[in-house]
Amino acid sequence: TFRGGGKRLRYFSVLNYKNDMGLLNSKYTDYTDRYNSQMKKYFLNLRMNLDVDITDATKLKLNMLGMLRETKRPTTSEATLFEQIFNTPSAAFPVQTQNGLWGSNNVLKTNPIANLADVGYYKLNQRMLQADLRLIQDLSVLTRGLSAELAIAYDNNATYQETAKKSFMYQTIEKGTDGEPVYTNYGNPNDELEISNKGLANQYIHANFEAKVNYHRTWDKHDFTASAMFRQESMTLTGANNSRYRQYIIGTVGYNFDNRYMVDVVANCFGSSVLGKNDKYRAYPAISAAWILSNENFMKGISAFDYLKLRASYGRSGYDIYDYDMDKQYWIGSGSYYFQAGNTSAGSSLKEGMLAMEQLDLEVADKYNIGLDMSLLKGLTFSIDGFYDKRSNILIEGSGLISSAIGVTIPQMNAGKVETKGTELSTMWKKEYKNFSYYIGANFSYAKSKVIENGEGYQPYGYLSKKGYPIGQCFGWEAIGYFRDEEDIKNSPVQKFSEVRPGDVKYRDLNGDKVIDSNDQKAIGYSTAIPEIYYGINLGFEYKGFGVDALFQGVGHYSVMLNTASVYWPLRNNTNISNWYLNDKIRWTEDTKDIANVPRLTTLDNANNFRNSTQWLENGSYFKLRNLNVYYNFPSSWAKKVKMEKIQVYARANNLFSLDHVKYMN
């Protein structure tokens, strides 16, 4: 970090380099001297801020951020690689045969180690530049408090791709009729490394221009601010029809009386190129008000309160990340026709595709908030907020809202609605002494969403509807145990998913029709997408330059479906089995039928057992030490000797421990 300058020019710059090495075994990532297939990430960031006072009335601000990033891995993706490692039993075959070829067998026909070491590499190089330039002109010569600003900004993010592929041969070993091993080779023995330099894989360019006029006056106990702004944005992504444009015309007015009563009003006229012709603009207002009670005379005698503020706000915003062709109808070439009676040969023709949207609109979010801020006892701060968000015009599938009798595919519609209510709290206590200081803070948020309209259409039973539940609410079957024997199966409702046997999961018949099918699902657990509760604790201290900072984070009211193959759902389609199933759980057998908590083992793809249900539902809440930072600040006298303001050495670690309910997976 470098900072300096004088009266007319000031600068600040930060250079940051980070190298993240992968966790793959170097014995195999260094398998060949032609390339290294280890997962690697390199980051190099350079930030520079420059402030120039051209004159006393004219100022220039330049901010720039440049980033170089390189990501490298085997040509086998991380997801595929770890899936193969999970699913391949460790004793299924040797990593390499005695002939030096990669091992495999006739069932799996893959080798995760070979797919790590001997398939080449995939590399992405990312180049990013973010720059903005702002000119500020004081116009007090015209009238006191008047100023103007001109700004331009340019972001360019480009990614270049290089792939080096090769194939390998693997060998299976089987016992012959004479008892001797029989070796069979599969795959391509070609050892050539085919390098494909795609060059520019994708590019995103974001540019904007802004012109703004500001006015600020104070007199007696009054403080008045106003501004008018015009902004033009353009965003371009690699590919066809990926450019979009936005315009903002924004006016703001703010008034403060005696630093006690404050009101701010914003009027935003927003235009988007994705909207139809002659229908490009929408209005998005906002208003906020605040009352600083601690500045009132009746609070002067209450020494415990250093600051007390009550505030409320309302605002509307829009969302326009939509495709361009939603208001157009296309004809597709999969139609057919017949000429003359008795002709059985169909001719090709066009037919109507999905209908066009009649009027595409923007998603709208109306946000209401009321809050209280306070500071107490010369060191304690506290804030509490209550909020209500109402989202409407959400783009959803229209097929559930219009009858299929129309005879053509229904387009999406701006008909979705979601409400969210919640509260947020935060507090901090700080104390400083001569050589020692410490702090401890906490935050908590609770937000519960409710789907009002999702376009799901008619449901034969009310409990099947996702309306009224949070976003991402988990739905599935209620598991009520396991079939004990054939008599139990005979006397129970018919489960339609697959043939059941003793030890298979037994589900509740919600509609009482003696059949277990898709009509017996219901809401189970919480959302699997968004936790309702977030909380955190941050604390630290410093003593004579030595300090520790720690951040703890947690979530609650969150569900996880344990459906990872081989880990929680074992042996399906010749996959693996984990310690979780073998040792941590009690699988169903004739001897354990009274205490079992997971179904019987089977190598078949058991559609009855392996589906979303309370059998596999787990509490997804956790509490973890997210960050720990230990540092030492050298005495300032040492720093001054080398012309620096501050010298600090530190050690930092992430995710040191976690308390949760999900074993083996994060």
What does each model-found stretch correspond to?
Residues 1-27, 194-198, 215, 489, ...:
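Residues embedded in well-ordered regular secondary structure
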Residues 1, 76-77, 326, 432-529, ...:
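Conserved small-residue
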Residues 95-97, 114, 502, 555-648, ...:
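Extracytoplasmic gating/loop element in the C-terminal half of outer-membrane beta-barrel translocons
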Residues 528-563:
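Glycine-rich, aromatic-lined ligand/substrate-binding cores of catalytic
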Residues 49-58, 63-68, 73-78, 83-85, ...:
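Extracellular/periplasmic, surface-exposed regions of secreted and cell-surface proteins
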Residues 1-74:
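Transmembrane beta-barrel wall of Gram-negative outer-membrane proteins
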Residues 226-234, 262-271, 507-530:
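Catalytic-site beta-strand/loop segments enriched in glycine and acidic/polar residues
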Residues 21, 136, 485, 537:
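Aromatic-residue-lined binding/catalytic grooves and analogous aromatic/hydrophobic interfacial grooves
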